[in-house]
Amino acid sequence: MSNKCDVVVVGGGISGMAAAKLLHDSGLNVVVLEARDRVGGRTYTLRNQKVKYVDLGGSYVGPTQNRILRLAKELGLETYKVNEVERLIHHVKGKSYPFRGPFPPVWNPITYLDHNNFWRTMDDMGREIPSDAPWKAPLAEEWDNMTMKELVDKLCWTESAKQLATLFVNLCVTAETHEVSALWFLWYVKQCGGTTRIISTTNGGQERKFVGGSGQVSERIMDLLGDRVKLERPVIYIDQTRENVLVETLNHEMYEAKYVISAIPPTLGMKIHFNPPLPMMRNQMITRVPLGSVIKCIVYYKEPFWRKKDYCGTMIIDGEEAPVAYTLDDTKPEGNYAAIMGFILAHKARKLARLTKEERLKKLCELYAKVLGSPEALEPVHYEEKNWCEEQYSGGCYTTYFPPGILTQYGRVLRQPVDRIYFAGTETATHWSGYMEGAVEAGERAAREILHAMGKIPEDEIWQSEPESVDVPAQPITTTFLERHLPSVPGLLRLIGLTTIFSATALGFLAHKRGLLVRV
């Protein structure tokens, strides 16, 4: 006995739920099969007395993320701004330097040129890469065969710029610079709107959070869909050899549908058996695309003591000894439940996972006390953390990364349907892929691909642009004339070299004219 419907959606994260909602609103009979005992996927809002609510997974939204903002608003959710009123801190070589703005200031002029050149070159290279087809970039092969470590070493002359560039990669994609393709990372930053947009709180990707937590997006769609959402149903088998697609779950339920949307991370396709087998390129692609490593940590305090010292809670922390490289204030908008959120990133997540929860908390508090210069940081009232590396139905967080050589070879199959299976998930997005915004884009696009396949909408309606959010408008990202035209360090050296040669030649000519050069 099988359950019949129009579309089975595999995965009840934001992408799968957004797809299911659109199909349901279009009058189709849809079933969502979710492996876990909850919806939300890589978003997860924990609720208890100590925290009220806390996002242990994806949390941040900001300007230009118009789809998630529209969907959340439709579901009755509101946003609030992450605190960035006071000063940020850059902690480097054991010292804390307060600053304002998205990037830490640099005082050494040579180092400044190096930093400026790195950010500018990242954005310049990104402009060469098509958001919807990075493998079509003019230098795609060359950039894809290079790791971000190689690119950083090539672009940065100073240790200071190399360290900040490395932290930037670790923070953006929860992976090491030697693990990721330069082409893929350049694409990733580009499709988030560039270096400033992706890294910024104000006017950037971390500007806001949802009041009540981001888990509500998926939960409220589940409320709308009712018993069409089936929890604790890991999909193990998809059969496309008959008139309808058959989908089997681990508890041996059968679902029969005209179409399927796979809204899980690409590599989790490995947990499903396919009949007929997947095409060669997809079969290999899903074995080659891992997810990043991160432990998200939230330390709670009696009050936001850092604000009294004119610090907003954002800390950018350099150095191997520091467990956390980046923090943000996670205090509730009302000013209660004071907290600092920090990420343990990439290899540090693997290393520090060996410790106990209590040992990690101790390390974090000691670090925050040092960076903030506040012994109050040693007196937490509560602690929550989530190690996403141990989640068998995510495989890691925030998102899938592409090692060198994979994107140009296999990238084009990411969203390519396999007969009646269509692919969603934030990884398949073309704008803010890796974020909740990308999840919504991908889910709704996959849903419209099916509506088109059923003859309900024309092909040119599959991809739709999104009007700008009226509540969260974007300010343009601007650069100064100097930032655009200052030379790089090698450029400066060449300039000095040319000037020296020119000066020496001119002096020699002058000396010769005045008879000051004696011929031997």
UniProtKB/Swiss-Prot annotation:
Bilayer topology annotation: Single-pass type IV membrane protein
E.C. designation(s): 1.4.3.21, 1.4.3.4
SUPFAM superfamilies given in the database record: FAD-linked reductases, C-terminal domain, FAD/NAD(P)-binding domain
Segments passing through the bilayer: 490-516
Matches recorded under InterPro entries: Amino_oxidase, FAD/NAD-bd_sf, Flavin_amine_oxidase, Flavin_MAO
GO MF annotation list: flavin adenine dinucleotide binding; monoamine oxidase activity; primary methylamine oxidase activity
Compartment annotation: Mitochondrion outer membrane
Membrane topology, Cytoplasmic segments: 2-489
Sites annotated Important for catalytic activity: C156, C365, H382
Cofactor: FAD
Record carries keyword Transmembrane: yes
The protein's enzyme class: oxidoreductase
Role this protein plays: Catalyzes the oxidative deamination of primary and some secondary amines such as neurotransmitters, and exogenous amines including the tertiary amine, neurotoxin 1-methyl-4-phenyl-1,2,3,6-tetrahydropyridine (MPTP), with concomitant reduction of oxygen to hydrogen peroxide and participates in the metabolism of neuroactive and vasoactive amines in the central nervous system and peripheral tissues. Preferentially degrades benzylamine and phenylethylamine.
Protein name: Amine oxidase [flavin-containing] B
Naturally occurring in which organism (per UniProt): Pongo abelii (Sumatran orangutan)
Recorded name of the encoding gene: MAOB
